[in-house]
Regions:
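Conserved beta-strand in the GNAT
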Residues: 79, 85-93, 98-105
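Conserved GNAT acetyl-CoA-binding A-motif
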Residues: 127-148
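C-terminal "cap" of GNAT-fold acetyltransferases
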Residues: 149-150, 165-185
């Protein structure tokens, strides 16, 4: 890593402490994490990412996610920034020793740049005592987006998520359950 000419323009702060640096070539060094609430300043960007990331049958509006978050002590809604750019979000539910990722999305222009992997890494840091559980569209050979489903599964596997051997069906679709290592009950 090289020294930055003006680190104050590139430093990422969390509670007044520098937690990472985004260098001038826009290569990710770290992310700023914020809780998404009703006064979230980038609600339009959040909505845009949600619309781009999820097909209509899987889409849930950020306003509905906020309502659910506000009504539950076990629900968290996180936003991620690279520098000043809002790049993605996670919506999750905590239950016993498990965190279930309900929604995870990264903006189209930030995909395949390492941001998704960094967010998953930070998720494990946020919840070190929890097993992270998520579901993905099953790699059904007859699916019209089979290539996308395989790429998504491979992405999670590269990031340490393993198949549990369990599947869940909702919204008329079948999803494969993955978890962050270890056994799954």
């Amino acid at each position: 890593m090289h020294l930055l000419e003006n680190p104050s323009d590139n430093a990422i702060f969390m509670s007044g402490i520098v937690v990472g640096i985004v260098d001038k070539t826009n290569i990710l060094m770290s992310l700023k994490i914020v809780r998404i609430t009703r006064d979230f300043p980038d609600m339009n960007a959040l909505e845009q990412i949600a619309v781009e990331a999820f097909p209509p049958q899987e889409y849930v509006s950020p306003q509905d996610l906020l309502s659910y978050t506000e009504s539950s002590d076990d629900c968290d809604f996180w936003g991620f920034y690279a520098g000043k750019d809002f790049i993605g979000y996670l919506h999750l539910i905590r239950y016993k020793n498990m965190v279930y990722v309900c929604f995870f999305a990264v903006g189209v222009s930030y995909r395949s740049c390492g941001y998704g992997s960094e967010i998953l890494s930070r998720l494990k840091e946020l919840y070190p005592a929890y097993q992270i559980v998520l579901d993905i569209e099953a790699a059904d050979e007859s699916a019209p987006n089979l290539v996308q489903r395989i790429r998504r599964r491979d992405f999670y596997r590269r990031n340490g998520y393993v198949p549990t051997g369990h599947y869940i069906a909702y919204w008329g679709m079948t999803f494969e359950i993955l978890c962050s290592g270890g056994g799954f009950d």
